Amino acid sequence: MTDASFAPSASAEFVRGLPKAELHMHIEGSLEPELMFELAQRNGITLPFASVEEIRAAYDFSNLQDFLDIYYQGAGVLITEADFKDLALAYFQRLAADGGAHAEIFFDPQTHTDRGIAFDTVMNGLLAGMDEAEKTLGVTSKLILCFLRHLSEEAAFETLEQAKPWLAKLAGVGLDSSEVGHPPAKFARVLQASRDLGLKVVAHAGEEGPPAYVWEAIDLVKVDRIDHGNRALEDEALTARLVKDGITLTVCPLSNLKLCGVPSLDVHPLKRMLDLGLKATVNSDDPAYFGGYLLENYLATADAVGLTRDDIVTLAKNSFAGSFLTDAEKAQRIAAVEAYAAAH
């Protein structure tokens, strides 16, 4: 295996076949316009769009608030267990086509329970999709419940209470939604309560929020992973700490570009993260809205920042090493990455 960059055509074939995991993907953010339209018709919901093309045009936003508006509007078509199953299965089919072997998907129960959908409906539907994906596609998955940080700590505790009958089916909890003004400290108690129940803890930090939020996430909340983490690079001591502790960063390049976290992909910090020894991974975040699933994120970023073959293999290995699989499963998956790289 050489450390030379390679032609985009060769890299696409190589990266598609490379075993890899996705650790940062919001299932509600994988709702494609076609499925939104189909579910609206199925459930008798009137959308402010006359066609799939009009929905797709609405997906062309340029800021976080416009994205959140269409995101929550889209979630409103998810009503039944079958809807959530279809949503999950559609994502896993795309992941499998991209060479994804494992995913740890986020879901936002408050987005659904606040509009009268039962927590159990969401869980039953998503789990059915996950089970079918494993049986028919060979893709394994885990589920991470996210608390919406623009809502209250009290609301998060209510959601955790609703989740208690489902603990065996949940790998962890996370924090998502509007970051600025809602530091990890706001949810420190509910995240500790979640950890006490045996759940892993992750948090979005350092996407729009300052490095101080990343410090809070690792020192106060004691997260198992940082979701995004780009702005950690502004603080040398924080970067050194993340390297020393080997904390995985679930980086989302095309999301950063779409939401103007970077002005262009060629200045994205992913390559610098790897060069500094950070445990960075590549992920799609909200792929239906941000212009690309897992493979597109790998290929677009590799081309823009000059990732080498070894960089790409490292990213794939990091994705399994940073997962919530067992140590034995991680070792098996990483060995599969190494075997593939050696054979190709």
UniProtKB/Swiss-Prot annotation:
CDD domains: ADA (cd01320). Substrate binds at D286. It catalyses: adenine + H2O + H(+) = hypoxanthine + NH4(+). One of its GO terms (molecular function) is zinc ion binding. Its EC number is 3.5.4.2. Keywords: Hydrolase, Metal-binding, Nucleotide metabolism, Zinc. Its cofactor is Zn(2+). The record marks H228 as: Important for catalytic activity. Catalyzes the hydrolytic deamination of adenine to hypoxanthine. Plays an important role in the purine salvage pathway and in nitrogen catabolism. This is Adenine deaminase.
